[in-house]
């Protein structure tokens, strides 16, 4: 499908003053996550014809062309202009999102994983109705009932543990600070920031999940307003839960995330600011 016109994109941006951006990689056309991504992009009520969605995709040519031709989202081939891995693709997508016609310094740039189809609804119906003019960053908080019901049970417990750990670290680090922040759902994934804070994400060079979260820590340390109190009734796709629950590979993936990501976040509270 062809990209929407600049005027159409501008109208979509200004409707909610937001842009969703994400990145993707699918090894083949049978990947369950590719189908979930298309659900995200093509939802009739909350998809790319309602909200501008930027996706930077690093899939093989056949998969990339399939994705691009089956949605009205703004699908770009990853150029690796901003580094390697998920982090580089995230920064590339953020830069494109910030460059869309109609965006201003206060426009919300909303990151989410492409497979989190229900998050589009949450942005429009829950987050954008509750954010405040003084908010700089939003870290949505999952409703616990929805979280526990829709996620693989192992992921529910690992992410709850990780959140408690990272919030304990944050409270300790802010004890003697003039800055404060409510508990954050660190391991959820989706977050949003005003376009004026784009530099916090572009200047951090992490290549994985740290590229999402370290800039949030930097923002807290610099005194920006982080709203982590907006609760969302997000439900993970049932097909993903069925694929992952009880799978040793996915259980070990969650364990590796805790052992790799969380220590990086802890360390950055003490490291010099990069920005």
Say what each PLM segment does:
Residues 117-148:
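Conserved donor-nucleotide/metal-binding helix-loop-beta segment in metal-dependent transferases, i.e.
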Residues 39-77:
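Acidic donor-binding segment of Leloir-type glycosyltransferases
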